[in-house]
């Protein structure tokens, strides 16, 4: 048996016995052992494969710039991040903006506002739309990242990536959604147009909040692997796949309001399948990055 055929046999075997991704995990571990992390290779890996949960926070921190590439500086940098976290926390406590009763995601929001120079004069002021986005993302991140210091920094840098790197791309996603839905199921798109629903779909939930509060975190983190590593376009294919999955239900609804309400509260039990199919769709239309571990 040649090396290639042995590798293929192992991959098929691993998949059949429930160990899909064993070789991918080994490849990632090799990448993470480098003295200097190769950010480009980590991006490529994250685009191509789901990250093992035990390495997700580390990879996200590297890709979001929270950690520098050099391993020997990681503990020093995270000690600095931790000190900064506690300094901001202390400042907010002193001015009585937060207390022990403040929900953790709201604490992260106030920290972010203080760092950004956007802390309102009173905690009772209504939240701005951008604050609601941060809050939704931070709530989802809490379920994915155990350590509170990591959770704050990842939430903060994830949102900054949306606001900076993806600032021009995000407004284009509704149009791309329409384009790809038309390619996958033109009849379904026609139904949405007939109901005048296309402009009223929950685009903010999908493309601003990146499905936080829509999909369970266990499924959502596989989508965010792609967002963190450089592709906000994956969000389009998750939206398309949601429509395809619930086509029968959506086709039976005859008003924009009913369609939107349903899509804002989709059943959770199909989420893993939706995300897997969405990633396949994304690879089908956008290609698969070449893995170069």
UniProtKB/Swiss-Prot annotation:
<keyword id="KW-0968">Cytoplasmic vesicle</keyword>
<keyword id="KW-0963">Cytoplasm</keyword>
<dbReference type="GO" id="GO:0033596">
    <property type="term" value="C:TSC1-TSC2 complex"/>
</dbReference>
<dbReference type="Pfam" id="PF00566">
    <property type="entry name" value="RabGAP-TBC"/>
</dbReference>
<dbReference type="GO" id="GO:0005096">
    <property type="term" value="F:GTPase activator activity"/>
</dbReference>
<dbReference type="GO" id="GO:0032007">
    <property type="term" value="P:negative regulation of TOR signaling"/>
</dbReference>
<dbReference type="GO" id="GO:1904262">
    <property type="term" value="P:negative regulation of TORC1 signaling"/>
</dbReference>
<dbReference type="GO" id="GO:1902018">
    <property type="term" value="P:negative regulation of cilium assembly"/>
</dbReference>
<dbReference type="GO" id="GO:0031398">
    <property type="term" value="P:positive regulation of protein ubiquitination"/>
</dbReference>
<dbReference type="GO" id="GO:0005765">
    <property type="term" value="C:lysosomal membrane"/>
</dbReference>
<dbReference type="InterPro" id="IPR000195">
    <property type="entry name" value="Rab-GAP-TBC_dom"/>
</dbReference>
<dbReference type="GO" id="GO:0005829">
    <property type="term" value="C:cytosol"/>
</dbReference>
<keyword id="KW-0343">GTPase activation</keyword>
<dbReference type="GO" id="GO:0031267">
    <property type="term" value="F:small GTPase binding"/>
</dbReference>
<dbReference type="GO" id="GO:0070848">
    <property type="term" value="P:response to growth factor"/>
</dbReference>
<dbReference type="GO" id="GO:0009267">
    <property type="term" value="P:cellular response to starvation"/>
</dbReference>
<feature type="domain" description="Rab-GAP TBC">
    <location>
        <begin position="50"/>
        <end position="231"/>
    </location>
</feature>
<dbReference type="GO" id="GO:0031410">
    <property type="term" value="C:cytoplasmic vesicle"/>
</dbReference>
<dbReference type="GO" id="GO:0090630">
    <property type="term" value="P:activation of GTPase activity"/>
</dbReference>
<dbReference type="InterPro" id="IPR043039">
    <property type="entry name" value="TBC1D7_dom2"/>
</dbReference>
<dbReference type="GO" id="GO:0036064">
    <property type="term" value="C:ciliary basal body"/>
</dbReference>
<protein>
    <recommendedName>
        <fullName>TBC1 domain family member 7</fullName>
    </recommendedName>
</protein>
<comment type="subunit">
    <text>Component of the TSC-TBC complex (also named Rhebulator complex), composed of 2 molecules of TSC1, 2 molecules of TSC2 and 1 molecule of TBC1D7. Interacts with TSC1 (via C-terminal half of the coiled-coil domain).</text>
</comment>
<keyword id="KW-0472">Membrane</keyword>
<dbReference type="InterPro" id="IPR039842">
    <property type="entry name" value="TBC1D7"/>
</dbReference>
<keyword id="KW-0458">Lysosome</keyword>
<comment type="function">
    <text>Non-catalytic component of the TSC-TBC complex, a multiprotein complex that acts as a negative regulator of the canonical mTORC1 complex, an evolutionarily conserved central nutrient sensor that stimulates anabolic reactions and macromolecule biosynthesis to promote cellular biomass generation and growth. The TSC-TBC complex acts as a GTPase-activating protein (GAP) for the small GTPase RHEB, a direct activator of the protein kinase activity of mTORC1.</text>
</comment>
<dbReference type="InterPro" id="IPR035969">
    <property type="entry name" value="Rab-GAP_TBC_sf"/>
</dbReference>
